[in-house]
């Protein structure tokens, strides 16, 4: 399974959409995970128009109807295991790991956690 990861695309009416080379790469995916800050329904429609299944979560810059349409977090089930998608890792007592455990409600640890918000790519 090939998964495309997006976050913080900030696509709104009248603003540029994703670069053509990125769109071509995403079309080759089986699933696109968007970790928030799509910004409005226009942006979500642009991502969904790429083709593969899209699972998106809400971010701090999302507005209007989009906030009601998207969940705070999503667990994508893949053949390799569960992938947790959320916008920002919580800054709460106990740290991110404890917060993730609480979000998942004891359903086991995910294979990976995908988040956005920082605008800095990072793999840990």
What kind of feature is each model-predicted range?
Residues 3-17, 21-34, 38-124:
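Conserved catalytic scaffold of divalent metal-dependent phosphoesterases
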């Amino acid at each position: 399974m090939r998964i495309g990861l997006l976050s913080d695309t900030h696509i709104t009416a009248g603003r540029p959409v994703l670069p053509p080379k990125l769109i071509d790469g995403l079309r080759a995916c089986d699933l696109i995970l968007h970790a928030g800050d799509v910004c409005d329904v226009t942006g979500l429609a642009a991502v969904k128009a790429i083709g593969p299944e899209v699972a998106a979560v809400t971010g701090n810059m999302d507005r209007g109807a989009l906030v009601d349409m998207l969940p705070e977090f999503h667990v994508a089930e893949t053949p390799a295991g569960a992938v947790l998608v959320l916008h920002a890792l919580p800054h709460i007592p106990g740290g991110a790991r404890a917060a993730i455990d609480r979000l998942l409600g004891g359903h086991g640890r995910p294979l990976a956690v995908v988040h956005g918000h920082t605008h800095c790519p990072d793999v840990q």
